[in-house]
UniProtKB/Swiss-Prot annotation:
Highest taxon of source: Eukaryota
Chain ranges of the tr-type G domain: 10-215
Catalyzed reactions per annotation: GTP + H2O = GDP + phosphate + H(+)
Chain intervals for the UniProt region annotation (G2): 61-65
Chain intervals for the UniProt region annotation (G1): 19-26
Function: GTP hydrolase that promotes the GTP-dependent binding of aminoacyl-tRNA to the A-site of ribosomes during protein biosynthesis.
Lineage of the organism: Eukaryota, Viridiplantae, Chlorophyta, Ulvophyceae, Oltmannsiellopsidales
Residue ranges, annotated region (G3): 82-85
Alphabetized HAMAP family for the sequence: EF_Tu_B (MF_00118_B)
Source organism per UniProt: Oltmannsiellopsis viridis (Marine flagellate)
Name of the featured protein: Elongation factor Tu, chloroplastic
Gene Ontology annotations for the cellular component aspect, listed alphabetically: chloroplast; mitochondrion
């Protein structure tokens, strides 16, 4: 059977459920897919157990269990990621295996914010999830409305602590389980038929309006990491790689950033699969012919970018997940002063880990396999670094950690 064509009639947004274990993330995900199936043939409703048996994925050699579902609202098409285990969230958010343009934080009205609620919020902040909408679940288990209001206040305070806009964020109370049961009983339930199903509609209306449509990759400033370089006699030097974002046209001025002093050059030709192009866009694997650049002045690990859009750095702070030995990581802890390779985009750069910081701000002296930690890194060579950039930490050819840049220092 022929594959269905992916119809791009609505803007696409990546979203995920986050929150403490057993607060109802997967149940809510199931309820959303069932309620939203009225808007589309896309993403027929998924039952709880279809979501919970999440397949394993490998991102940078790390095994992550994530479940992907899709659904549509009146205004948008969503790809929704739900992770069964807490460790999966940590790995997913740090490796960016499933990018999130926004998140639904699920908090049980019976318990209020718990340790993982806070840990997921901290991670969401540091990996750059821009906006969050809250679903206050298990409302049916709270008899007293005042208690629910207290929990809501506590949630808003917690959001403020992690620099999300606690006053402004929509918080929708409801019961994912009762909504799901109502939808299983009458899958045709529309808005106004059932108070619990209405909570799901209300949640998604808030997600539609509060979580911004992400800027498309093609609208961002041009960037391509250089993978290979060769010279064509009589024509000049060609740098090849995959365009990470933006658009590049013949005649554009671009900057070569990283490893050496930043220089400017002009694009004189573009080729893809032996054909010439006038312009190349995000996602293309392309060869870029550059004017007046010697082959020895470009090397793998540099980037070609729109002038002024990215600069070379050597010092940054990052949130890192350290692989367990079962995942192929180290068997032993490491300490400040450890000098592994940092694999960024297309190249390894040696760097020194100067210090580690725990979530509460205290300095830790040692990092164990399986830990998540904030670290201060100094690279021996400057490379193009920006906030939110992902990297892997390697040692002797194997990945021992994955990280995301949270702050640039120098």
């Amino acid at each position: 059977m022929a594959r269905e064509k992916f119809e791009r009639s609505k803007p696409h947004v990546n979203i995920g459920t986050i929150g403490h274990v057993d607060h109802g993330k997967t149940t809510l995900t199931a309820a959303i897919t069932m309620a939203m199936s009225v808007f589309s043939g896309a993403g027929a409703g998924k039952k709880y157990d279809e979501i919970d048996s999440a397949p394993e994925e490998k991102a940078r050699g790390i095994t992550i269990n994530t479940a992907h579902v899709e659904y549509e609202t009146e205004n948008r098409h969503y790809a929704h990621v739900d992770c069964p285990g807490h460790a999966d969230y940590v790995k997913n958010m740090i490796t960016g295996a499933a990018q999130m343009d926004g998140a639904i934080l699920v908090v049980s009205g019976a318990d209020g914010p718990m340790p993982q609620t806070k840990e997921h919020l901290l991670l969401a902040k540091q990996v750059g999830v821009p906006k969050i909408v809250v679903f206050l679940n298990k409302k049916d288990q709270v008899d007293d409305d005042e208690l629910l209001e207290l929990v809501e206040l506590e949630v808003r305070e917690t959001l403020d602590n992690y620099e999300f806009d606690g006053d402004d964020i929509p918080i929708i109370p409801g019961s994912a389980l009762l909504a799901l049961e109502a939808l299983i009983e009458s899958p045709e339930a529309k808005k106004g038929d059932n108070e619990w199903v209405d909570c799901i509609y209300s949640l998604m209306e808030n997600v539609d309006s509060y979580i911004p449509t992400p800027e498309r990759d093609t609208d961002k400033p041009f960037l391509m990491a250089v993978e290979d370089v060769f010279s064509i006699t009589g024509r000049g030097t060609v740098a090849t790689g995959r365009v990470e974002r933006g658009v590049v046209k013949i005649g554009d001025t671009v900057e070569l950033v990283g490893l050496k002093d930043t220089t400017e050059t002009t694009v004189t030709g573009l080729e893809m699969f032996q054909k010439t192009l006038d312009e190349s866009v995000a996602g293309d694997n392309v060869g870029i012919l550059l004017r007046g650049v010697q082959k020895e002045n470009i090397q793998r690990g540099m980037v070609l970018a729109k002038p002024g859009s990215i600069s070379p750095h050597t010092k940054f702070e990052a949130q890192v997940y350290v692989l367990t030995k079962e995942e192929g990581g180290r068997h032993t802890p490491f300490f400040p002063g450890y000098r592994p390779q940092f694999y960024v985009r297309t190249t390894d750069v040696t760097g020194k880990i100067e210090s580690f910081v725990a979530d509460d701000g205290s300095a830790s002296q040692m990092v164990m396999p399986g830990d998540r930690v904030k670290m201060l890194v100094e690279l021996i060579n400057p490379i193009a670094v920006e906030k939110g950039m992902r990297f892997a930490i390697r040692e002797g050819g194997r990945t021992v950690g994955a990280g995301v840049v949270s702050e640039i220092l120098a």
